[in-house]
Amino acid sequence: MYTILIIDDEPIVKIALRSILPWEEHGFFICGTASNGLEAVPLIEKHHPDIIITDLKMPEMDGLELIRFLKEKEYPGEILVLSNYEDFDSVRSALLLGAADYLLKIKIQPDTLLACLNKTTKKMQNTADRKDSILKTGITE
């Protein structure tokens, strides 16, 4: 079961994300929610979520600041960015900082979110398999 932390300053979005999918039926567990990056940091340290779904525009610590912070701390999980903004610069910045994918809130559908999550978990599994293979064979890059 993959753990997910949802970060968004809009309560309705957090409620919608919790109810958009039967999470556990698809192998996911929502370990918590936060209203901004600053509030999320202790939850990340406590739960070590596999996947973080974060908004970009939030008070106190926005999504880009959170991604930068997590990159500095060498966060091993994946980050999916949700936003209302079709702002190419924000998308590009989030992806360059290491976000796995970017989804628009207004266009999010259960099948779209699930496809994104499945793509992300497949990437995580491939990375883990590759690391295991390297450790077993003693080959380093």
Model-inferred region functions:
Residues 58:
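Receiver (REC) domain active-site loop signature in two-component systems and cognate sites
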Residues 47-53:
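Active-site beta3 strand of CheY-like receiver
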Residues 7-8, 55:
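Active-site residues of response regulator receiver
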Residues 25-35, 43, 91:
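Short hydrophobic/Thr-rich beta-strand motif most characteristic of the beta2 strand and flanking loop
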Residues 92-141:
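Interdomain helical linkers/hinges and coiled-coil/dimerization scaffolds
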Residues 11-32:
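Two-component/phosphorelay signaling modules centered on CheY-like receiver
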Residues 36-39, 62-65:
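Acidic catalytic/metal-coordinating carboxylates
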